[in-house]
Design a protein with these regions (language model features):
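Conserved catalytic alpha/beta core of Sir2/sirtuin-type deacylases, generalized to analogous enzyme cores
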Residues: 1-189
Length: 189
């Protein structure tokens, strides 16, 4: 099974146990991962600048926060796996909430959730990670709009922004496009 076939809202509709097996495993993995030394190097570099640094990331793992970066200086353009939303927001609500109480139990061999499916706090239906997936018309981006607004405000104050792009691929070019916009003529988001 390819990444795009499980990393989409339809997977939660067709096989929620498998979808949550995949995302539950990722959630647990990210919770247990300690940020590597590169995060500390970036943090120290950012502290050398008068206006500090601002993180633009497509990673959904929360590692920048875990590494001690200011959460008010992070824009997670694809959301966070540590936040949940209703799988059917048009039928329920567009609220999000932290996944801190979720403790998924996963059968690693089958990649299936063996514990109870996470439920929407508002309607009791299926919950899903609040991350932008492939073919995703239901992602609730509202929590990240405030992050984006803070980034835009910060960029207006920086005369010559230094962009350090790490690990940005070609398959999903969101980070590369952002870097190019900042580098070319100081364009904003």
């Amino acid at each position: 099974m390819g990444f795009s076939s499980i990393a989409n809202p339809e997977a939660f509709e067709n096989d929620p146990t498998l979808a949550w097996g995949f995302y539950g495993h990722r959630l647990l993995s990210y919770r247990n991962t300690q940020p590597h030394q590169g995060f500390n190097l970036l943090k120290k570099l950012g502290e050398r600048f008068t206006l500090g640094s601002f993180i633009f990331t497509s990673n959904v793992d929360g590692q920048f926060q875990k590494a001690g970066f200011d959460p008010l200086r992070i824009y997670e353009c694809h959301g966070s796996i540590h936040t949940l939303q209703c799988a059917k927001p048009d039928d329920c609500c567009r609220n999000t909430w932290l996944a801190i109480d979720e403790q998924p139990v996963i059968d690693i061999d089958a990649c299936e959730l063996t514990s109870a499916l996470p439920k929407c706090l508002y309607c009791g239906g299926l919950a899903r990670p609040n991350i932008l997936m492939f073919d995703d018309w239901f992602w609730q981006a509202r929590p990240y709009q405030q992050q984006k607004k803070r980034l835009e405000q910060w960029l207006t104050q920086v005369e010559a922004p230094l962009v350090i792009e790490i690990g940005a691929g070609v398959a999903i070019p969101t980070v590369r496009h952002f870097s190019e916009r900042v580098a070319n003529n100081g364009e904003r988001l």
